[in-house]
Amino acid sequence: HEGLAAAGRDREEVTIDLFVTMSVGDDEAAAIADIRAWATSQAATFHPWKRMPPAWERFRPEFARAADAYHLVDHLSLQARHRRIVSDDFARSVALAGDLDTCVDRLRRLWQLDIDRITFALLSGGRQQRLAHLSGTVIPAVEAAGRN
């Protein structure tokens, strides 16, 4: 809220929309593989940062490798060579991946932050199926868990 105060604005004047990339599946390794190309694209953009959040300092070598290997033409390609550049730990730090319970728990914790809404980025491959699963299973599970 420091930026709001410095600008003389109230929190109610700003909409905070958290964009979430997520892969839900019973096979955790497959879910992580599903988010890896997107995570690599993020790592490539972090490479030039001079100041890094302390929790991400350990990923600097991955950011450098991603910057060298990432090609926009293969941005979310499931076959992109750059998808293997980043570690599982980094991929999990920028996206949600795992079974339904894991993703629902993380979404509920994110919703507790001072945000107004969550927008879900749809990954490549089977987007209609992903959207149907999100709207028919994931969101209702988050809503049901919120009532408990």
Language-model region placement:
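An alpha-helical appendage that flanks or caps ligand/catalytic pockets
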Residues: H1-R109, E143-R147
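Short secondary-structure boundary segments
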Residues: L122
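Glycine-/small-residue-rich active-site loops that bind phosphorylated ligands and cofactors
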Residues: S23, G125-G126
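C-terminal helical cap(s) of enzyme catalytic domains, especially alpha/beta-barrels
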Residues: H1, R127-R147
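Structural motif
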Residues: L113-I115
